[in-house]
Amino acid sequence: MFNQYTRLLILSLSFNYTLIGQDVRLNEIVSSNSTFYDEDGDTPDWIELYNYGNKIINLQNWHLSDDRDNLKKWSLPDISINPNNYLLIWSSGKNRKLLYPRTIIRRNDYYKYLIPNIEPDPNWTYLNFNDDNWDYGQSGFGYSDDDDKTVVPDGTISVFLRKKFEIENLDDIHSIFLDIDYDDAFIAYINGIEIARANINGYPPEFNSEDVNSPHEAEIYRGGVPERFVIEDHQTILNEGENILAIQGHNINSQSSDMTVIPFLSAIFKNPSLQGHEPDQILDLESYFQLHTNFKISSNNESIYFTNENGKIVDEILVDGLLPGNSVGYSNLSNEVVNFIRTTPGYRNSSQEFVGTVKEKVSFSHQGGIKDSELNLELSGKKLGQVIRYTRDGSEPNSNSNIYKDKIKIDESTSIRARIYEEGYIPSEIKSESYVIGSNHDIDILLISTDPENLFDDENGIYTFGPPGSYYPNIPFFGANFWEDWEIPGHISFFENNSKRSAKFNTGIKIFGGWSRGQNGQRSLSFFARGKYGDPNFKHKFFDNLEYDDFESFVIRNSGQDWLRSNIKDIMLTSLMRGSEIDFQENNPVATYINGDYWGMYNMREKINEHMLASKHNVNANEITILTNNADVLKGDNNEYNQLINFINNNDLSNSENYEYVSSQIDIDQYTLYQASNIYFNNTDWPGNNIKFWKHPKTKWRWIMFDTDFGFGPWWNLNNYRENTLSFSLEVNGGDWPNPPWSTLLFRKLIMNNSFKNQFINRYADELNTRFKPENVVNHIYEVYSTVEPEIIKHFERWKNDSSVGYNINNIKSHVNHYVNNMVIFARNRHSIARNHIMSQFNIRNFHSVMIENENLNFGYVKINENIDIDTDRWTGQYFETVPIEIRAIPNPGFEFSHWSGDLSSKNEIINISLMKDLNIQANFIYTGPLNVYPNPSKDLVYIVEEGVESFDVIIYSISGKIMGELSQVNKIDIRHLPKGIYTLKIKSSSNIFYKKIVRD
């Protein structure tokens, strides 16, 4: 992420004590950077210093500040700047001085190594392993690339390496990482803990494994650089003193033409250190000499102060009205402070300079959106000496665009974009409005504006195929432009249906999705809020069901495999899990326009990333790890998860201690629901695909549900509700797709534990008794369909004749209803089939009903398996023989639980039942409010008192439940005729029923 410009800046630094001079100044300042990256991959503001004199200047105890009342806000370290050289300082707020990189293990270092012909001792990765019988050789290891110090025989499948190293002070280490050049795969460990791997499966892979994903060519011998792996949690992995780096290098097969393993291990120290060696230039560790202030820069009316060691202000520059990506600094011609469009860190400031930036903004007389009829648009906001230039096609205005002189007639759908120009000034920010004339929509509306060439240019448009011959000729047309990770600038306007609420943002736009990029003419899009476009986030409540309204990105999805069918399958299935532990993307159907052209209906969705998860769970997004498929990294690293999978693969989870460890790492409650849901859905584009899971230091591993288009069976299979997805998800030897062995491993191993098995079965049963009940799912299908139905006809009319469709759609309503009805058929039939799959898989003979009754819901409620809160006076569910269920009585405030009655009797609030027949159980609660019974214990009379009540009806029960007496309209009871013991009084007033225990002495 650190580019050539910032490397040049490092060359200007000197770390010697030198003469103090004054010929250094602020040279260039950027308050909204999006082009240059720091060592973390971020794009913070920056300040550039320039030594315009002829002496080296030491900057120790010089200061930068954005506050005149606190000129010593950030002090520079002991660092010097050479004559005619530049120093870039990130104004990020990270407050970093110097760090010191050292390479602990270098190329050409000696290792103990082994080329095995049998599986090595499993302890070979640990420090105390005896490697006396291993060979001794220099790195690199391999053959045929002419860069191998230790040449191994041609056709070698694997080589095992061990190298000891020392760490003196763990607290002085800022970070540590492995750089490694490899052909074709490797796994690396420190002190027995996996720290990195690439291109190979298995936990651990066998010594002769050829389960390498694909050929991977080494880089160094052909002028490239090794791949870097940052080691997370190094404080828990490393020892002070001796450590061991162990690497298992793999070839793709014995016929491979070459093999390479060249490792480097480097550490970044907080203080100068003599440990290790000066880093090899190929590692590019100069980036760790970067400096960061403890403040950021405002783009509006803020001065930056530069003071020398005596506290004297050497220079001061006002930052005011800078647009994203522009800078302020000194002119090379006049030596005056000017503005620049092109920033030049490490070089002379640009010769294209401007007096300043136009601060005025264009105002539109009419807000964009859906309009009933044509309108005359007025643009205003300019002052004397300025002109407004505008475009009508979505492109950004430039110096050749139309000059606004009179009202603009808007009689067709269009996008107007305008900005103010003034001679010698950078033009103002662009303002955009989109107008749709004469259309009507009953859902929210999204209007997109961008230069048409950004999307549709035959050569470079992100929506197009690209030049002929540049892509694979069959679906999904790999290599086409729409498969590239290209981002274009644009503008969006969002209008809420039946509301005046709207939102407008500048944005970046990409093509989004998988197979549907090439399969569907309507391509999915993703939108990004970035500082370089002016909007660092999308602040708007796009989704009614979310409590938060701050987004860094979102997507509009074309419905994937369900496009031009029901168009609701994925949003229906994922939203069915609303209110559960499952993380999923909320949705909102939107009528969409691109540059005024109707582009059909999309499903607006949250974008799965660390920001979505942070918003849902109130954690720090920067600390989140997200993995996909076979532990591929989306964010963070996979070391911790791979170690967990390694443990799971090599240990018996029927052992309670092993299972307890795994359950301490995985959110078992969430995982059982995730598995049960995908199995019920019959999602057969899973589990070997469409899986994402995540972790934060404060959480366990959790799974995300997304892209469920294959759920409820693919559209071509009408009897898919019969398919046994439970067996499918436990398959030991599935093919490469959709259920390869790695994808079923976790579930297969967990199900061996009886506690997990019972929890999974009960969670599946809980959902079948509630969320997945046929009537509930059918109602949900129709409810979701009702949200898109108003737009369906328009959407299909827009796309039904597109060349990507491949079939005729004659009657749109009938066509869509066919696919909606298919889902209804699935919902009505899957329920009973799913129960049969459970009984078949786990050899369960039968299931039975349990009826829970609660005559007064105001007194308390019943909870089943810690999942279902029963809020009705009579509830029935079905559960399986030999799988105990937990039933808990929970009294409301002012009440207490009395006892269970019916087909069983118990005074315990929690009961565990193995159903071997149908049961009917009543929960009984008693009132413990202001009613008083006294004296208690008593030998003769008991009085009943409640404020405002004169008399009560009373039934006296023995401890066995036998009625010992009934009285009407009394406020005292004579109990002298009762034998000594404990009794329960059922006391009924005009408004309440109370239960009170009394003791007859």
Please provide the spans of the model-predicted regions.
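Short, compositionally stereotyped local motifs that mark structural "simplifiers"
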Residues: 80-83, 87-90, 269-284, 301, ...
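Conserved ATP-binding subdomain of kinase catalytic cores across diverse folds
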Residues: 448, 466-636
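Middle-to-C-terminal accessory/interaction subdomains
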Residues: 316, 327, 336-341, 345-353, ...
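Extended carbohydrate-recognition surfaces in non-catalytic/accessory domains of CAZymes
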Residues: 99-174, 201-230
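A structural motif detector for short, solvent-exposed N-terminal "entry" segments of globular domains
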Residues: 20-68, 99-101, 166-182, 271-302, ...
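C-terminal outer-membrane/trafficking sorting elements
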Residues: 895, 929-934, 938-1001
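Aromatic-lined ligand-binding clefts that engage carbohydrates, nucleic acids, or primary amines
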Residues: 111, 134, 157, 165, ...
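Conserved beta-structured recognition patch
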Residues: 99-124, 284-345, 505-517, 789-795
